[in-house]
A protein has these predicted regions:
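Structural signature of tandem-repeat unit edges
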Residues: 1-3, 11-25, 35-49, 59-72, ...
Length: 174
């Protein structure tokens, strides 16, 4: 099965990401810091987890369509995606990581295509939606209690944009 390796498009000037059906995985930081990325559509893929920082700091990102078999959204997946307004989720989603949508100031819609499809609770780390000023948590999202000595700590440097030195990878296997 094909997939995007870690940092595949990190810092690249791509505007859209739409992966074909034979993609089964995506690496951490695959599209981190893609300042021009506006839309992500993974609906046709077999991806079951989004690892950490997949789309972090994509400041123009407006909409993400997640794949139907996705069960896990990792930590800081969309950290500081300040333009993100909509995330279309699958009904299989069960876990949302720490600061997954932290700083997504415009986030308003986080839902499946059909509201009737939600059959289970989605567990989210306690600050998964921190600094999402326009977001109202759906009743089917359960925020987990904070754990550990640093669980309530929030590092301002994570929220603010920072320079990332990474080069997009070119791989003929894609």
């Amino acid at each position: 099965p094909r997939g995007l390796p870690e940092g595949a498009f990190c810092g690249a000037g791509i505007e859209q990401l739409c992966l074909p059906s034979d993609f089964h995985n995506i690496g951490p930081r695959a599209c981190e810091n893609c300042k021009s990325l506006v839309e992500v559509n993974l609906m046709g893929t077999e991806i079951t987890a989004l690892p950490s920082s997949t789309f972090a700091h994509c400041v123009a990102l407006n909409c993400i369509w997640l794949p139907p078999r996705l069960t896990l959204i990792g930590k800081e997946v969309s950290l500081n995606c300040v333009a993100l307004q909509e995330v279309v989720i699958p009904t299989e989603l069960s876990d949302i990581g720490n600061r997954a949508f932290c700083g997504c100031e415009q986030l308003q819609r986080f839902a499946p295509l059909d509201w009737g499809d939600i059959e289970q609770w989605v567990q989210a780390e306690h600050n998964a939606f921190f600094m999402c000023d326009k977001f109202e948590k759906p009743q089917w999202v359960e925020l987990l209690p904070a754990e550990g000595p640093d669980s309530d700590a929030f590092d301002e440097e994570l929220y603010h944009e920072y320079p990332i030195s990474c080069q997009p990878m070119v791989d003929s296997r894609w």
